[in-house]
Amino acid sequence: MCQTMRCILVACVALALLAAGCRVEASNSRPPRKNDVNTMADAYKFLQDLDTYYGDRARVRFGKRGSLMDILRNHEMDNINLGKNANNGGEFARGFNEEEIF
């Protein structure tokens, strides 16, 4: 008995959340396309409507990913450290511009 009541409660909550999500999407409907944009005020109003509609969808997400320079810098540091520590051939580590010693 308790298990069926729990299943019914979960189904009701899921349907309520789905209905709330649909209501939010309906309130943010895209502004209609009007071909009767004759004045600058009409065009400005249309652009404002587009900005409010697409504003939350097209904003840049700062802080979500590291910058390209940080990634490249870390990659270079890893390569430098790997080159110094991965000398498995028994040779002496030399610099880039140093000649080979015989």
Swiss-Prot record:
Expression sites by tissue:
Expressed in midgut, brain lobes and ventral nerve cord of larvae. Predominantly expressed in two pairs of protocerebral neurons in the larval CNS (at protein level). Intense expression is also seen in the fan-shaped body of the central complex and two lateral areas of the lower part of the central brain that appear to harbor the giant commissural interneurons of the giant fiber pathway (at protein level). Upon glucose feeding, two additional dNPFergic neurons are consistently detected on the ventromedial surface of the subesophageal ganglion (SEG) of third instars larvae.
The protein's GO terms of the molecular function aspect are: G protein-coupled receptor binding; neuropeptide F receptor binding; neuropeptide hormone activity
Q: Which residues form the propeptide?
A: 27-32, 66-102
Instruction: Report the residues modified as Phenylalanine amide.
Output: 62
**Which cysteines are cross-linked by disulfides?**
none
Loss of function: phenotype: Increased NPF or NPFR activity dominantly suppresses PAIN-mediated food aversion in postfeeding larvae. Deficiency in NPF/NPFR signaling causes decreased alcohol sensitivity and overexpression causes a hypersensitive response to alcohol sedation. Controlled functional disruption of NPF or NPFR neurons rapidly triggers acute resistance to ethanol sedation.
Give start-end of the signal peptide. Answer: 1-26
Q: Does the keyword Cell wall biogenesis/degradation apply?
A: no
Biological process terms in GO annotation: circadian behavior; circadian rhythm; digestion; G protein-coupled receptor signaling pathway; larval feeding behavior; larval foraging behavior; larval locomotory behavior; locomotor rhythm
Where in or outside the cell it occurs: the entry states:
Secreted
Tell me if Membrane is a UniProt keyword of this record: no
**Record-stated family:** Belongs to the NPY family.
Query: What is the stated purpose of this protein?
Result: Integral part of the sensory system that mediates food signaling, providing the neural basis for the regulation of food response; coordinates larval foraging and social behavior changes during development. Required in dopaminergic (DA) neurons that innervate the mushroom body for satiety to suppress appetitive memory performance; a key factor in the internal state of hunger in the brain. NPF neurons coordinately modulate diverse sensory and motor neurons important for feeding, flight, and locomotion.
Tell me the protein's name.
Answer: Neuropeptide F
Protein's organism:
Drosophila melanogaster (Fruit fly)
Gene from which this protein is expressed: NPF
